[in-house]
Amino acid sequence: MSGRSRGRKSSRAKNRGKGRAKARVRPAPDDAPRDPDPSQYQSLGEDTQAAQVQAGAGWGGLEAAASAQLLRLGEEAACRLPLDCGLALRARAAGDHGQAAARPGPGKAASLSERLAADTVFVGTAGTVGRPKNAPRVGNRRGPAGKKAPETCSTAGRGPQVIAGGRQKKGAAGENTSVSAGEEKKEERDAGSGPPATEGSMDTLENVQLKLENMNAQADRAYLRLSRKFGQLRLQHLERRNHLIQNIPGFWGQAFQNHPQLASFLNSQEKEVLSYLNSLEVEELGLARLGYKIKFYFDRNPYFQNKVLIKEYGCGPSGQVVSRSTPIQWLPGHDLQSLSQGNPENNRSFFGWFSNHSSIESDKIVEIINEELWPNPLQFYLLSEGARVEKGKEKEGRQGPGKQPMETTQPGVSQSN
């Protein structure tokens, strides 16, 4: 045998010895702690993988020795179920499967992998399952004597469930407690609803009513302030409008005659008198509009001496509506009221309305002046004859046939068809 072949044999023997030395794992002694450090699992797997890599050069005795060593480790792990880690065995089995798939070997290695897989399943089912690295500890790991209790598959798998179940039971108990407390409170409220609750409601109602009265008083004061403010602004515009109207001769007389309803109260002489009307003012009595004061300003005319005629409406001491008017100082031979005393149409004349204080509740003229003529006299001044007749027909249609003026006949005078 040559020296080269001797060197090869010696190197193989050395490699075989190294592989055996690194692949051998000493079992843990009986007095070892019950909870091995997870770093030992990692170092054990790394040593086994290193041994397999170093033993990869030979396919003979080295593979068999490594397989035997792994089998012996599996048997020792099966004997020490509470002490070993099932996850480590699964990792070694997975490594063997991966190595076998990457590098197919003899049939003996494949059968060993199958045996390891079967042993691993058995160990994972009946043995212990080690806690993975950096995983949280579940439950109390120490026994009654203060020593660490072994973690079995049952305790590791059921530990969180038992704790969760305990919490659910605790939550259910808490729920029952809250429901019972709510029922007790409801019963107490039902039992306590009696005269004391009614008295409290009355006190609350009185407080709310008092607040409403205070709010209404504040609203009234605010309304009065706004009425004064905008009344002054409105008065400025009204004065400006009156000044402009005075520069238009016969403006108010024409507006009276063009109004479809006011024109029915005017005869030919009254239309002549109203032609001297140069200004009209409507003054509201009080901020609450409790009455009206209508002022008619006339130029010098051949009918009466008054420069202003006033018709006033207001509330009397007992609350009824009363009216007052200025006595008209008629010139001789031009007293329209005395000339029309025997005429039944006197009540439908303008000056008959001015001096009459009996039919106040059904006073139509003051309503027309306050609500239609005074707010916008320009629209009636600009009405033509055709537009005035058309507008009068529209108003009569809205009022209905019952409100149309009835024709009156003088006694002893018969009407002919």
Curated annotation (Swiss-Prot):
A Pfam family (short name) is NAP
Query: Which Cys-Cys disulfides exist here?
Result: none
- Gene that encodes it: TSPYL5
Q: Where is this region: Disordered?
A: 1-55, 93-112, 127-202, 391-417
What superkingdom does the record give? Eukaryota
Its BP terms in the Gene Ontology are: cellular response to gamma radiation; nucleosome assembly; positive regulation of cell population proliferation; positive regulation of phosphatidylinositol 3-kinase/protein kinase B signal transduction; positive regulation of protein ubiquitination
Q: What name does the UniProt record give this protein?
A: Testis-specific Y-encoded-like protein 5
Report the function annotation for this chain: Involved in modulation of cell growth and cellular response to gamma radiation probably via regulation of the Akt signaling pathway. Involved in regulation of p53/TP53. Suppresses p53/TP53 protein levels and promotes its ubiquitination; the function is dependent on USP7 and independent on MDM2. Proposed to displace p53/TP53 from interaction with USP7.
Q: Tell me, how does this one assemble?
A: Interacts with USP7.
The biased composition feature labelled Low complexity covers 93-103
Q: Name one GO molecular function term.
A: chromatin binding
Residue ranges, compositional bias (Polar residues): 406-417
Instruction: Please provide the record's keywords in A-Z order.
Output: Growth regulation
Report the sequence similarity comment from the record.
Belongs to the nucleosome assembly protein (NAP) family.
- Record the organism: Homo sapiens (Human)
